């Protein structure tokens, strides 16, 4: 590292000890001790130094590495960082995919339940409408039955009134028939007590449409001619 020397006197590190200040300057041991008020010769900041050797802090040791080696190390480190981040991203994506899959399954399950609930609601709604129709029909049928029952309850009284009117019509004949017919006793008297025994009666008492004057009732041929001859049915008068 020929490029390292004291920034104040120019001495090389192989000739004396060198120190690295906190402000980024390098001074030899003599210059460091002779620093006025312990200030940096260049920037006038307080001197805080670390000896440059193999025991230097790792973060300060990086300042003295070969740039090419440092670049190679940085590339390797960068590769490790990239690989680490890629692996973590892959794991992250897998976790997110698993969560998305679970969410999809939960969504599908919820959707299936929603469809089942919707179908059940529609089924119950249809059953409710059918029950309403049945209830309406039952009410109409009930009203018809109640009307029929009322009609049947009123019908006996109507039949009773009709029968009563018919009974009154039969038991109370018109006054004209009574006046025309008369009681049975009067009718018997009007018949002159006509005897049905034709043998005990003379033919002169029988009413006929033929005049009986100047007729000899004792002649048998006359009676036969009047009541028997030339007729389809024989005379009801018994011959003597």
Curated annotation (Swiss-Prot):
Residues 152-189 are annotated as: Disordered. A zinc finger (RING-type) spans 6-44. The gene is zhp-2. This is Zip homologous protein 2. The keyword Cell division does not apply. Its main location: nucleus. It comes from the Eukaryota. Recruited co-dependently with zhp-1 to the synaptonemal complex between homologous chromosome pairs to regulate the formation and number of crossover events between homologs during meiotic recombination. Together with zhp-1, promotes the accumulation of pro-crossover proteins, including zhp-3 and zhp-4, at a designated crossover site along the recombination intermediate. Limits the number of crossover sites along a recombination intermediate by restricting the association of these pro-crossover proteins with other recombination sites during late prophase. InterPro entries: Zip3/RNF212-like, Znf_RING, Znf_RING/FYVE/PHD. Interacts with zhp-1; the interaction is required for their chromosome association and stability. Gene3D superfamilies: Zinc/RING finger domain, C3HC4 (zinc finger). Coiled coil: none annotated. PROSITE patterns: ZF_RING_2. Keywords: Chromosome, DNA recombination, Meiosis, Metal-binding, Zinc, Zinc-finger. It is found in: Chromosome. The keyword Transferase does not apply. Expressed in the germline. One of its GO terms (biological process) is reciprocal meiotic recombination. GO terms for cellular component: chromosome; synaptonemal complex. Pfam families: zf-RING_5. One of its GO terms (molecular function) is zinc ion binding. The lineage of its organism: Eukaryota, Metazoa, Ecdysozoa, Nematoda, Chromadorea.
């Amino acid at each position: 590292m020929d490029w390292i020397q004291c920034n104040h006197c120019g001495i090389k590190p192989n000739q004396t000890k060198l120190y690295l200040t906190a402000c980024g300057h390098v001074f030899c041991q003599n210059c460091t001790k002779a620093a006025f008020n312990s200030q940096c010769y260049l920037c006038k900041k307080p001197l805080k130094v670390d000896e440059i050797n193999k025991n230097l802090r790792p973060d300060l040791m990086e300042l003295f590495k070969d740039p090419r080696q440092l670049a190679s190390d940085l590339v390797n480190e960068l590769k490790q960082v990239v690989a680490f981040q890629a692996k973590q991203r892959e794991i992250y994506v897998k976790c997110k995919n698993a969560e998305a899959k679970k969410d999809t399954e939960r969504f599908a399950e919820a959707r299936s339940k929603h469809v089942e609930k919707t179908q059940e609601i529609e089924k119950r709604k249809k059953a409710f409408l059918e029950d309403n129709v049945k209830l309406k029909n039952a009410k109409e049928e009930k009203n018809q039955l109640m009307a029929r029952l009322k009609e049947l309850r009123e019908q006996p009284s109507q039949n009773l009134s009709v029968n009563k009117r018919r009974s009154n019509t039969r038991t109370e004949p018109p006054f004209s028939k009574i006046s025309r017919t008369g009681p049975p006793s009067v009718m018997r008297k009007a018949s002159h007590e006509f005897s049905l025994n034709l043998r005990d009666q003379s033919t002169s008492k029988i009413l006929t449409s033929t005049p009986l004057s100047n007729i000899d009732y004792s002649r048998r041929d006359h009676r036969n001619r009047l009541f028997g001859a030339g007729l389809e049915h024989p005379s009801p008068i018994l011959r003597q």
